[in-house]
Amino acid sequence: MRLVFAGTPAVAVPSLTALAARFEVAAVITREDAPLGRKRILTPSPVAIAAEELGLSVIRANRLREEAIERVRVLRPDVGVVVAYGGLVHEPLLSLPRRGWVNLHFSLLPRWRGAAPVQHALIAGDRETGAAVFQLVPELDAGDVFGELRRLIRPDETAGELLDDLARSGARLLADTVAALADGTAVATPQSGEPVAAPKLGIADAKLDLTRPADEVYARFRGVTPEPGAWALLDGERFKIHAVRPTAAGVLPPGAVVADGKRILAGTGSRPLELVTVQPAGKRVMAAADWWRGAGGEAVLS
């Protein structure tokens, strides 16, 4: 089975590695090198780095347009595979591979179609999630499903932790699906149920509303960690919150911050949450207790 792979971030690397171990990867499509860090140094994507380490041909393209399409046409792949590429596959590229394109998506479709399925699952308080491999069609994440895996969501799991786990287990599912396509045993089933959208999250979505119950605040914290990154306002500036814990402490006014022994607690609409690691505006990441001492023992988050 000769394939073309399209992916960009680190979560796509396990899939590329699994596929390269079992099939001929004719080329890897990934987004162009991007400036990163304070010095804005042009940096290859994690998939580009992995592909070059595997000795694979790399096509860098932020949009799958004429040049990328022509390069894929020449390769004559049997199938195209997409894992978090960061762009849509349109015609005529969609029909170029003999078996079309398949996509590894990190949710149980049709729930959470879109760019941020793991984040939305956590924010919504879902107890179960998974990954699915489906046939790519023009409608977003709407194709027939070849296979899926299911798993429970741990109560303290962040989006980053859950996504890393699904990336590993999903890679095995994806490679097995491509093998089934190769030997003619793959069977796809139409999606069943009401679709739910999972659009990309922005900075505004990561703000914690401390007037809401603690369970809701904690669910949003987990869903936006590590990206876009949870925050609240402190003296009108963005106060980043890198780690929190649920508590059974007594009720505090929403946003009120107090010390309780060695713990730093922040009030919500129900029980407080413990602030563990924070980052005040313009400062480094630090333990909440260190920040509290420097703040003079008085702060209100909003």
From Swiss-Prot:
Keywords: Protein biosynthesis, Transferase. Pfam families: Formyl_trans_C, Formyl_trans_N. GO terms for cellular component: cytosol. It catalyses: L-methionyl-tRNA(fMet) + (6R)-10-formyltetrahydrofolate = N-formyl-L-methionyl-tRNA(fMet) + (6S)-5,6,7,8-tetrahydrofolate + H(+). Disulfide bonds: none annotated. (6S)-5,6,7,8-tetrahydrofolate binds at residues 107-110. Transmembrane segments: none annotated. It is an enzyme of class 2 (transferase). Its EC number is 2.1.2.9. GO terms for molecular function: methionyl-tRNA formyltransferase activity. Signal peptide: none annotated. Belongs to the Fmt family. PANTHER family: METHIONYL-TRNA FORMYLTRANSFERASE (PTHR11138), METHIONYL-TRNA FORMYLTRANSFERASE, MITOCHONDRIAL (PTHR11138:SF5). HAMAP family: Formyl_trans. Attaches a formyl group to the free amino group of methionyl-tRNA(fMet). The formyl group appears to play a dual role in the initiator identity of N-formylmethionyl-tRNA by promoting its recognition by IF2 and preventing the misappropriation of this tRNA by the elongation apparatus. This is Methionyl-tRNA formyltransferase.
